[in-house]
């Protein structure tokens, strides 16, 4: 494994650990998810380019489309929660609370 792949893999791990540790606020969770998607996109693009695997060249674009949809839904959820409750705590999303 080259150093570039290792750094990208470590970026994914750091984003994943951030998602596990800082999950009280919705904005920090969304930022960690975006970091994970960015590192996946870069890793997928570099793997396809280095292996000359042209049949899968559409996969990074599809991943970017899903990342954009995830970001749009996450930000709309953030706006809805912050307008309703005044904060962006993830615990406000629990519908089973009384």
From Swiss-Prot:
The enzyme's E.C. designation: 7.1.1.2
Broadest EC class assigned to this enzyme: translocase
Compartment(s): Mitochondrion inner membrane
InterPro entries: NADH_UbQ_OxRdtase_chain4L/K, NUOK/Mnh_C1-like
Transmembrane segments: 1-21, 29-49, 61-81
Membrane disposition: Multi-pass membrane protein
Keyword Glycosyltransferase attached: no
Annotated keywords: Electron transport, Membrane, Mitochondrion, Mitochondrion inner membrane, NAD, Respiratory chain, Translocase, Transmembrane, Transmembrane helix, Transport, Ubiquinone
GO biological process: ATP synthesis coupled electron transport
Catalyzed reaction equations: a ubiquinone + NADH + 5 H(+)(in) = a ubiquinol + NAD(+) + 4 H(+)(out)
MF (Gene Ontology): NADH dehydrogenase (ubiquinone) activity
Cellular component terms per the entry's GO annotation: mitochondrial inner membrane; respiratory chain complex I
Record-linked Pfam families: Oxidored_q2
Predominant localisation class: mitochondrion
Quaternary structure (record): Core subunit of respiratory chain NADH dehydrogenase (Complex I) which is composed of 45 different subunits.
Protein family (similarity comment): Belongs to the complex I subunit 4L family.
PANTHER family cross-referenced by the UniProt entry: NADH-UBIQUINONE OXIDOREDUCTASE CHAIN 4L, NADH-UBIQUINONE OXIDOREDUCTASE SUBUNIT ND4L
Functional summary from the UniProt entry: Core subunit of the mitochondrial membrane respiratory chain NADH dehydrogenase (Complex I) which catalyzes electron transfer from NADH through the respiratory chain, using ubiquinone as an electron acceptor. Part of the enzyme membrane arm which is embedded in the lipid bilayer and involved in proton translocation.
Protein name as catalogued: NADH-ubiquinone oxidoreductase chain 4L
Organism name: Arctocephalus pusillus
Lineage: Eukaryota, Metazoa, Chordata, Craniata, Vertebrata
């Amino acid at each position: 494994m080259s150093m570039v792949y290792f750094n990208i893999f470590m970026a994914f791990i750091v984003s994943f650990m951030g998602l596990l540790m800082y999950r009280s606020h919705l904005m920090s969770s969304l930022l960690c998810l975006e970091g994970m998607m960015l590192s996946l996109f870069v890793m997928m693009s570099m793997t396809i380019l280095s292996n000359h695997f042209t049949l899968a060249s559409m996969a990074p674009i599809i991943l970017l489309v899903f990342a954009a949809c995830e970001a749009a839904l996450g930000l709309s959820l953030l706006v809805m929660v912050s307008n309703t409750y005044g904060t962006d705590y993830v615990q406000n999303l629990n519908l089973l609370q009384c």
